[in-house]
Amino acid sequence: MAFDELLNDPVIQKYLHELVGPTGMPVAAAPPDGEVTDEELAEELGLELNDVRRALFILYENDLATYRRVRDEDSGWLTYLWTFHYENIPENLQSEMYRLLDALEERLEYERSHEFYLSEPAGIRFEFSEAMELGFQCPETGAPLEPIENQEMINAMERRIDSLQSELNVGVTQTV
């Protein structure tokens, strides 16, 4: 996938937005070709230098940017020259999908193996053992704890897991 195609993909835009937030999005959405300093980016984009640096370091932490330091011979100051590596985005997204799949599978097992009770007035859900310790009364409101069915949540999680497995081409059993 070409660099420009990546940046036009709404999934990629959402991913970058989740990483750097709204203030860092101008940095993430308009990466220059070649090396650039944080000061040049701040000036070019009309942003605060700290916002640019924050976005750059987040991109760096996610393997989407690298830097090299150059010391100015006259002043002794270090200049950071940044290069963007958005070719790593598809791999990063796939890793995120695997993490999500693992978390959903773990949560699904938890939901299946526990019975829950709800304090409707407080909007708090308790496991059976907690509810029993509390005498089936909400500690905040004193309202009785009512058993709740979580099958809809389980079904939704199963659908999402199936969808992720299909996208990742994993965990799908094939009949022979």
Swiss-Prot record:
GO terms for molecular function: DNA binding. InterPro entries: TF_E_archaea (IPR016481), TFE (IPR039997), TFIIE/TFIIEa_HTH (IPR017919), TFIIE_asu (IPR002853), TFIIEa/SarR/Rpc3_HTH_dom (IPR024550), WH-like_DNA-bd_sf (IPR036388), WH_DNA-bd_sf (IPR036390). The winged helix domain is involved in binding to DNA in the preinitiation complex. Residues 8-90 form the HTH TFE/IIEalpha-type domain. Belongs to the TFE family. Signal peptide: none annotated. HAMAP family: TFE_arch (MF_01909). Monomer. Interaction with RNA polymerase subunits RpoF and RpoE is necessary for Tfe stimulatory transcription activity. Able to interact with Tbp and RNA polymerase in the absence of DNA promoter. Interacts both with the preinitiation and elongation complexes. Keywords: DNA-binding, Transcription, Transcription regulation. It comes from the Archaea. Transcription factor that plays a role in the activation of archaeal genes transcribed by RNA polymerase. Facilitates transcription initiation by enhancing TATA-box recognition by TATA-box-binding protein (Tbp), and transcription factor B (Tfb) and RNA polymerase recruitment. Not absolutely required for transcription in vitro, but particularly important in cases where Tbp or Tfb function is not optimal. It dynamically alters the nucleic acid-binding properties of RNA polymerases by stabilizing the initiation complex and destabilizing elongation complexes. The lineage of its organism: Archaea, Methanobacteriati, Methanobacteriota, Stenosarchaea group, Halobacteria. It holds the Pfam family TFIIE_alpha. GO terms for biological process: regulation of DNA-templated transcription; transcription initiation at RNA polymerase II promoter. This is Transcription factor E.
